[in-house]
Amino acid sequence: MQDQGSDAVSMFDRHFLVERADNQSALQEAQRLRHQVFRLERGILPGHAQARLEADEFDHASHHVILRQRRSGQAVGTARLIVGGWQDGRIGGFPMLRYCAPGMLRDLPMGTTAEISRFALSKVRRQGGACMDGLLRYGLMRGILRISLDLGLTHW
């Protein structure tokens, strides 16, 4: 007999697919979904109104995940993993550094540290209730974990 966790994972796998956005077309799909969620649904981030994309200077140093509904192929979630590092002899490359005290991340191994951001779930999918919401978050984190393992990351 399977436990409830295994049943939930099986249900997720039947209905959703986690993909890496590893080309320009997939990246733009993730940016369109971010525009939809962050600008149109929540009104919290500026976006490129003409292109209907939510993009910033950190996208180029990021690995992106797309959560897709299997049946329709529709992207319903996205997140990114920003790979940081040293810039000009100091820690750089993470949006959170804009808000942290200087030196706060000094002890982290920058070569294996990343920041998770732009975690977005479509309003349409969020309406599925707490169970669905949890499964979708699980899916995005599964993608983030897969990328982290592939890159040898040790810290988020």
Model-derived features with residue positions:
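Residue-level preference for short coil/turn positions at secondary-structure junctions
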Residues: 14, 61, 109-112
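Conserved long hydrophobic alpha-helices within structured protein cores
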Residues: 32-37, 79-81, 111-121
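N-terminal start-of-chain detector that recognizes signal peptides
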Residues: 35-40, 52-53, 85-91, 128-130
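Short, His- and charge-rich active-site/binding loops that engage polyanionic ligands
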Residues: 61, 66-107
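Acidic, low-complexity proline/glycine-rich segments
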Residues: 1-3
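Acyl-donor binding region in acyl/amide transferases
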Residues: 87-88, 92-156
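Short amphipathic alpha-helix that is part of the acyltransferase structural core
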Residues: 6-56, 64-71, 75
